Amino acid sequence: MNKLSRRCIAVGAALTATIGVVVSSSPVQATPSTATSKVLVQASVRPTRVFTVNKTVTGQPWAALLATYGVSDGYVVENDFQPGQSTGWHSHPGPSLIFVVTGSITNHASDQWRCKGVTYAAGSAFLDAGGTDVHELVNAGTTPAETIAVQFIPQGQPRRIDKLEPSNCHV
């Protein structure tokens, strides 16, 4: 290989590496929220350990466990969705209990097959485990929807972390 060929290969490799760095380091935008969120209450919650065992009205066993091993930031959040609005893809570092107050909400989550979603009507509730769970809430209905979320977040952590749509959603 002559000197000119080696120089061309070196320049080509350098350009390829530079273009690769520019392409791979360009910012990727998360899907923005179009719903309106309002924090109704924020409070510091001491470490808690609650374990309750009881029975349902039909005599079936029932149990609940809530444990935090550090101070938490507790939130009560109201989310309002016009038809077609969503939270955008995001996660939370701690669990959330979501109550659907009016309308209906579809929860698309990364652990669902192709993120197909589960729809919840007014009067129902569901749990978001937090951590690595990436999800998006969507009002796919024709009327406004409202949710109330009760969240436990490790103290000092952001309440919401914007994410990209998971790659398994459209396989």
Where are these regions (language model features)?
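Ligand-binding loop in jelly-roll beta-barrel domains
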Residues: A121, G130-P158
